[in-house]
From Swiss-Prot:
Comment field on protein domains: The Q motif is unique to and characteristic of the DEAD box family of RNA helicases and controls ATP binding and hydrolysis.
Localization (cell): Nucleus, Nucleolus
Protein name according to UniProt: ATP-dependent RNA helicase DBP8
EC number: 3.6.4.13
Disulphide-bonded residues: none
Source species of the chain: Candida albicans (strain SC5314 / ATCC MYA-2876) (Yeast)
């Protein structure tokens, strides 16, 4: 089966060949023909299965027959994912003079307004920033959205959660009604909210909603090539254990993503590990967009060996060469654990995931093990003796210096000010706390 066999335009098949993408994946083989036949579509497949091309290929095929703007709107929950999707659209349509605009927070608002007024062929946006333009940028800016032929919700399970509700509705209000556009939902996890959309009465004059789920997360939770282990530590020496894990013989040269639950933790670890001579980048919502983009590029290019991230990076981002995932903090939702460790052991490669477990994490670990139907193994190569001997002193000094720097710089204040300015100070999205001064 080739992309030509699925109905993809010849020029696009050639672009895919040039990118060394020769054979459609399961999600692409199922969804591309259905979308080309006019079906609304719900596609579920794990991260790294080619979901972006599953919706991009049919959209670009039909766009090339009638290349107006704005032809397609793709909404995504994170800025990084929006930039990544835009890169793929630009690469696929490079020979066709495709025009793509990215509308996300952290970038120049006026420049985005001008880009929307030029009516690009495709707009990739986060709901919050696009809603801001709809409210504030005038009819000339948003008029192109009223002609959109395709609406895509990527990582639909997150977009359909309550936190995006009002912004999404504001975006939907300026789009053509559902009978005059195709709506495509793609996600790694088909939740009840997503599945319920399939059960709605069909739109008159349109074919029924097509839904295809490839190896749901329940069935392929953990690849057989992924080694899952843990260390059990007192919370006050977690950082020292992290340092020791990164120095283990089997991990000392590995590319690694360290997941944390809070932006403050991400920043503490970034500064601390740099002081300990690790090549580190970080990705969290407290960083300006330019720094986030630069961090991702540094990590992809190998300039940074370690990426420290909140869960903003655990979905969808194309980081194909990760060899080690460390859960410095344990997520409350077992599915978030699955998405995190899904950054490694891809395409049959081996990978490791190590969780640093504290005394308060036992219930979460039990829920995770029940969800993945697998017990974690104790990582015996690191223990109290070698941590105390090799890591504790240097790590404690580096952590203390990092906390003092952050306190001096009022880390976290910018976000509080911005949220108050926009009337959002009573809303609790991603938790940001000002670091406490170290008692050591």
């Amino acid at each position: 089966m080739s992309f030509n066999d699925l109905g993809v335009a010849k020029w696009l098949s050639e672009s895919l060949d040039a990118m060394k993408i020769y054979t459609p994946t399961a999600i692409q083989s199922a969804c591309i023909p259905a979308i080309l036949k006019g079906h609304d579509c719900i596609g579920g497949a794990k991260t790294g299965s080619g979901k972006t091309i599953a919706f991009a290929a049919p959209m670009l095929t039909q766009w090339s027959e009638d290349p107006f703007g704005i032809f397609g709107l793709i909404l995504t929950p994170t800025r990084e994912l929006a930039l990544q999707i835009a890169e793929q659209f630009a690469a696929l349509g490079a020979n066709m003079n495709i025009k793509v605009a990215v509308v996300v927070g952290g970038e120049d608002f006026v420049q985005q307004t001008l880009a929307l007024q030029r009516k690009p062929h495709f707009v990739i946006a986060t709901p919050g920033r696009l809603a801001d333009h709809i409210l504030n940028s005038g009819e000339e800016t948003i008029s192109g959205l009223r002609r959109v032929k395709y609406l895509v919700l990527d990582e639909a399970d997150r977009l359909l959660s309550n936190s995006f509700g009002s912004d999404l509705q504001r975006c939907f209000d300026v789009l053509p009604t559902s009978d005059k556009r195709q709506t495509l939902l793609f996600t790694a996890t088909i939740t009840d909210a997503v599945r319920a959309l399939k059960e709605k009465p069909p739109t008159p004059g349109k074919p029924p909603v097509f839904m295809h789920e490839v190896e749901t997360v329940d069935k392929v939770a953990i690849p057989s090539t992924l080694q899952i282990s843990y260390v059990f530590v007192p919370s006050y020496v977690k950082e020292a254990y992290l340092n020791s894990i990164l120095h283990l013989e089997q991990f000392k040269d590995s590319t690694a993503v360290i997941f944390v639950n809070r932006t403050t933790t991400a920043e503490v670890l970034r500064r601390m590990l740099r002081k300990l001579d690790f090549r580190v980048a970080s990705l969290h919502s407290e960083m300006p967009q330019s720094e986030r983009t630069n961090s991702l590029h540094r990590f992809k290019a190998g300039a940074a060996r370690i990426l420290i991230a909140t869960d903003v990076a655990s979905r969808g981002l194309d980081i194909p060469t990760v060899e080690l995932v460390i859960n410095f903090d344990i997520p409350a939702d077992p599915d978030d654990f699955i998405h995190r460790v899904g950054r490694t052991a891809r395409a049959g490669r081996k990978g490791d995931a190590v969780s640093i477990i504290g005394e308060k994490d036992i219930d979460r670990i039990q829920s995770i093990e029940e969800r993945i139907n697998k017990k974690m193994e104790l990582l015996e190569d690191v223990n109290d003796d070698n941590v105390i001997k090799e890591s504790l002193s240097a790590t404690s000094v580096a952590k203390r210096e990092s906390l003092m720097e952050m306190d001096k710089e009022n880390f976290g204040e910018r976000k509080k000010i911005n949220r108050k300015k926009h009337g959002l100070d009573k809303v609790k999205p991603e938790r940001v706390t000002k670091p406490k001064k170290s008692k050591k």
